[in-house]
Amino acid sequence: MFNLKNRNFLTLMDFTPKEINYFLDLARDLKRAKYTGTEVQRMKGKNIALIFEKASTRTRCAFEVGAKDQGAHVTYLGPTGSHIGKKESAADTARVLGRMYDGIEYRGFGQEIVETLAEYAGVPVWNGLTDEDHPTQILADFLTIREHFNKPLSEIKFAYVGDGANNMANALMIGAVKMGMDFRIVSPKEIPTDATLVAKCKEIAAETGAKVTITDNIEEGVKGCDVLYTDVWVSMGEPDSVWESKIKLLTPYRVDMNMIKMTGNPDAKFMHCLPAFHDEETAVGKEIKEKYGLSEMEVSHELFESKYSIVFDEAENRMHTIKAVMVATLGDQ
């Protein structure tokens, strides 16, 4: 057993492999308890603030449902629902909310904001996504891999394909090296992964037995992989010029049936943190089609809907793993 009471959850860098496994074991147990109707509420009477400077489906729902299941109450502060960073500093916001709430979730921009909240709040602070990291997503990903593969995480070969400079590439690399995985980032050289973070992760890999490979060679990068993972190529709000250049660079890196076959692994799985641009059924999808002539972006519709895709198991596990983080750091032991 581990006592993680009152710990912040800002990045997986802050946790040992054993502690990460504890979160995953607890998430598995909470999932079973929910399915069997035997869940015990360990956060009765707790009040949780959810600060969302960026919109969300999965993260918000996971925190709200997870908290409700465990007997806690939540207050949602949306993009226009708080003064943080506009009329009030993150430090002042933290000291106010820390007087009223037992835990605070933050989803927004710079990692330094969630770190400031954690420094001043005096209660557990959880990172629901920043520009640099997305640790709750990684717990969901690793729980999903555990469920689909009959081997430990340390034996998993994993390739992240696409934008090697985004927060998912960072977060997956941190989690993968902690757990001793063979991890590859397959991305154009023009979109480099943060060199300082790569160096730090390689240091950790030397201790855990993990491997880190950064390559622009798709065939080499995906060979033998158990999991191919991708994320959106561009973020909402980025200028058209960025969209155009990134789409041009990343189109050869679209994950499709051919790439899954390149792994040489008939049991390979496809993962994505969602939302995914795999068809024209959204306003953004239609806009991409009109501007760039693409019916699909980072993943082909065929692969997204295929037997290889486990994206909705992964999405469900956001709730079970986020619940585990809250229970471990805030729940009655």
Curated annotation (Swiss-Prot):
It holds the Pfam family OTCace. Its EC number is 2.1.3.3. Pathway: Amino-acid degradation; L-arginine degradation via ADI pathway; carbamoyl phosphate from L-arginine: step 2/2. It is found in: Cytoplasm. Carbamoyl phosphate binds at S56, T57, R58, T59, R107, H134, P135, T136, Q137, C273, L274, R318. NCBIfam families: orni_carb_tr, PRK04284.1. Reversibly catalyzes the transfer of the carbamoyl group from carbamoyl phosphate (CP) to the N(epsilon) atom of ornithine (ORN) to produce L-citrulline. This is Ornithine carbamoyltransferase. It comes from Clostridium botulinum (strain Langeland / NCTC 10281 / Type F). The gene is arcB.
